[in-house]
Amino acid sequence: MTNASEMPRKLTILGSTGSIGTNTLDVVRQLGGRDGFEIMALTGAGNIALLAEQAREFGAQLAVTADDDKYEALKSALAGTGIKVAAGMAGLEEAASMDAGWVMAAIAGTPGLAPTLTAARRGADIALANKECLVSAGDVFLRTVKQGGGRLIPVDSEHSAIFQCLTGEYKQAVERIVLTASGGPFRTWSRDEMSNVTADIARAHPNWSMGLKVSIGSASMFNKGLEMIEAKYLFDLRPDQVDVIVHPQSIIHSMVGYTDGSYIAQLGSPDMRTAISYALTYPERGNLSVERLDFAKLARLDFEAPDEARFPALRLARMALERGGLQGAALNAAEETAFHAFVAGGIGFLDMAEIVETVMDRMHDGRTAETMDDVFSADEEARRHALELIATKEKAA
């Protein structure tokens, strides 16, 4: 970090054993380790050995496993260290409640909602990697952040890029934002070719190193659809101001178009640690060891319009934006449920979008989210509908 007077920053990482979490800790190492950050709490799911190793290395005050059944294993792994151990939702809430000025919200899926909201309520600055907070509960979540008084710094490379491109600019001068998408491993595949795709094939991303959920979301472009909804809330945009362009090289991470016809873009190597570092050091920048761009070797940068016929996730995301209400929650919960069924081999790759659209149509009734209870209720309903549709497809197969 560039300003030692603010060191160390107190940091809690919700989801330290996942892809974002492990990269966050690598950034912490590069930015001074314990001299740069005081790790208050680390949370993980089933990888107890890694969680315990992280807690010991960084001297965390609290280590939490989200799995109640893994409590004794974690307690045993950290015996004699003086590190407090907790488990389950109560443990996640305790971690989010600790006196950390910065919280990395990296628990994937709906389970990350409650602890992230807890951190927001107490006024922590949130480095947001959890998409569900905005996709499912956008208005409610933003209201909570505002009331708590903390800042919201995006961690997704695309939203981090937009955030940086907007710095120092007039909001009224923004004409549109353009999120870039690599196109994933199936960018040039036909729907017939995609019909027989397995999870192992879908997880192989051409540019980025990511976890299973995000990798498959990139292949289906549901990940980009969720990012469209996130962008609307993060930057207070109309649905028609959010665009997507396919950029196979993943060098331009996103851009902002202004009313005078100019564009500002953020470029960099496809390494999520850059956006993580920016979120953890904002408004400064850290000294990070990542691959630098060599512009002389960048022979070309390609762009193409996304094909929504082959990748309907983008159309469904725009539909959720235009309909509003609880459609984001319905899309997210249905997609998450369909993803698990696809990974388990119960449905095909193309079935995911079909299931999501059917669930969204069933729940298109004008309801809005006034409280988190409304969001959780919609989430539960969407999952129930999705499971019914999945069961029908499994039976037919």
UniProtKB/Swiss-Prot annotation:
SUPFAM superfamilies, alphabetized: 1-deoxy-D-xylulose-5-phosphate reductoisomerase, C-terminal domain (SSF69055), Glyceraldehyde-3-phosphate dehydrogenase-like, C-terminal domain (SSF55347), NAD(P)-binding Rossmann-fold domains (SSF51735)
Cross-referenced InterPro entries: DXP_reductoisomerase, DXP_reductoisomerase_C, DXP_reductoisomerase_N, DXPR_C, DXPR_C_sf, NAD(P)-bd_dom_sf
Name of the protein: 1-deoxy-D-xylulose 5-phosphate reductoisomerase
Positions bound to Mn(2+): 156, 158, 227
Pfam families: DXP_redisom_C, DXP_reductoisom, DXPR_C
PANTHER family: 1-DEOXY-D-XYLULOSE 5-PHOSPHATE REDUCTOISOMERASE, 1-DEOXY-D-XYLULOSE 5-PHOSPHATE REDUCTOISOMERASE, CHLOROPLASTIC
Signal peptide span: none
Key word Cell membrane present: no
Gene Ontology biological process terms from the UniProt entry: isopentenyl diphosphate biosynthetic process, methylerythritol 4-phosphate pathway involved in terpenoid biosynthetic process
Keywords: Isoprene biosynthesis, Manganese, Metal-binding, NADP, Oxidoreductase
Residues annotated as transmembrane: none
Species annotation: Agrobacterium fabrum (strain C58 / ATCC 33970)
Gene3D superfamilies to which the protein is assigned, alphabetical: 1.10.1740.10, NAD(P)-binding Rossmann-like Domain
Family: Belongs to the DXR family.
Pathway terms, separated by semicolons: Isoprenoid biosynthesis; isopentenyl diphosphate biosynthesis via DXP pathway; isopentenyl diphosphate from 1-deoxy-D-xylulose 5-phosphate: step 1/6
Sequence positions that bind 1-deoxy-D-xylulose 5-phosphate: 131, 157-158, 182, 205, 218, 223-224, 227
